[in-house]
Amino acid sequence: MMSYDAETGIAKVKCQSQSTCGACSARETCGTESLSELNGKRGEHIFTLETITPLRTDQMVEIGLEEKSMLFSALLMYIVQLFTLLVATLLSSYISENELIRAILIFMLTALSFVMVKRYTRKLGQQTEFQSVLLRVLF
């Protein structure tokens, strides 16, 4: 945990995701670890959550998200963009024969879907079922 305000009950928690590459026997021949090393830091995320449990800085805590919200987020991030890409491709073939115009249209519609999903997820983040919760204090 990074910080905790006892008056408001708001805690800032830094999460670090870890790859399982370190325990894999095929690690030497697999390119996944090499690619993840190119990205630099592994996923560090900062979450803000409300809790009535008194906390101290540098405590290790476990947080969680509702499964429904995780599945819905995955749907938004992957399926919506894929569906938009497919629909844009089909639409562009009816609109123009010129491949450059088709490519620009596909790119613009797909980019628009990313923007719309980002705006929508900001609104979803305000709802309680899409906010992380403190499950327990580890130490």
Swiss-Prot record:
The keyword Membrane applies. One of its GO terms (cellular component) is oxidoreductase complex. Its main location: membrane. Keywords: Cell inner membrane, Cell membrane, Membrane, Transmembrane, Transmembrane helix. The chain crosses the membrane at residues 71-91, 97-117. It is a multi-pass membrane protein. It is found in: Cell inner membrane. It comes from the Bacteria. Belongs to the RseC family. This is Uncharacterized protein HI_0589. The lineage of its organism: Bacteria, Pseudomonadati, Pseudomonadota, Gammaproteobacteria, Pasteurellales.
